[in-house]
From Swiss-Prot:
GO molecular function list: lipopolysaccharide binding
Regions annotated as coiled coil: none
Entry similarity comment: Belongs to the BPI/LBP/Plunc superfamily. Plunc family.
Tissues of expression: Expressed in parotid, submandibular and sublingual glands.
Listed name of the protein: BPI fold-containing family A member 2
Name of the coding gene: Bpifa2
GO BP term (any one): defense response to bacterium
Organism the protein comes from: Rattus norvegicus
């Protein structure tokens, strides 16, 4: 009888603790901010080689350079967890599958879409490094060409970079103790938005820096090809 009573008390404590942890995780997720700006520091910190991209004058060569550079980027510390906006994560696997282009809804700009796949480990509040997820996500960014009034040369203008949360897919890798599983199931919905923001914070500054180094003629050529139907890639 004593054992049964102790078990009831223990279950009550676990339920209360899990509710508290869910609240802690929710607070961490809600406090995430989106960082979205290209910076010279991005290239310096990641040791990006943009020489071939700067020399590219056609879209095919620029696309190849962007994909090659992105797929070589070391995202965080592969041997440990990287702090990011109150959460800790480690990117175990990462790949950009493609770089697709299409005409934007205004008929003047180019919309770029990058399908991404990740395997990520999260360290959640109190629980520790217990959550491994596989993620597929589309990263979106618009670009346009504007003529420099002083030089008369075309220049690249960047739109907002964002993750397409309508297309995000998250799968939990492996299961653990029932107590931990309950917490993971409870936060899986929260993680959809959190993962999108975290990946935007990691990749958007990198992508925008790469796009900012492109020649205007490469984007102008891409826009001309899309407008004339020579390049029609559905987004």
């Amino acid at each position: 009888m004593f054992q049964l009573g102790s078990l009831v008390v223990l279950c009550g404590l676990l339920i209360g603790t899990s509710e508290s942890l869910l609240g802690d995780v929710a607070n961490a997720v809600n406090n995430l901010d989106i960082l979205n700006s290209p910076s010279e520091a991005v290239a310096q910190n990641l040791n990006l080689d943009v020489g071939s991209l700067q020399q590219a004058t056609t879209w095919p060569s620029a696309k190849d350079s962007i994909l090659e550079t992105l797929n070589k980027v070391e995202l965080g510390n592969s041997n440990g967890f990287t702090p990011l906006n109150g959460l800790l994560l480690r990117v175990n696997k990462f790949r950009v599958l493609d770089l697709q282009a299409g005409l934007s809804s205004n008929g003047k700009d180019i919309d770029l879409k990058l399908p991404l796949v990740f395997e990520i480990s999260f360290s959640l509040p109190v629980i520790g490094p217990t959550l491994d997820v596989a993620v597929s996500l589309d990263l979106l960014n618009s670009v346009s060409v504007q003529t420099n009034a002083q030089t008369g040369l075309p220049g690249v203008t960047l739109g907002k970079c964002s993750g397409n949360t309508d297309k995000i897919s998250i799968s939990l890798l492996g299961r653990r103790l029932p107590f931990v599983n309950r917490i993971l199931d409870g936060v899986s919905g929260l993680l959809t938005g959190a993962v999108s923001i975290l990946l935007q914070n990691i990749l958007c500054p990198v992508l925008q820096y790469l796009l900012s180094t492109m020649s205007g003629s490469a984007i102008q050529g891409l826009l001309s090809n899309v407008l004339t139907g020579q390049l029609a890639v559905p987004l």
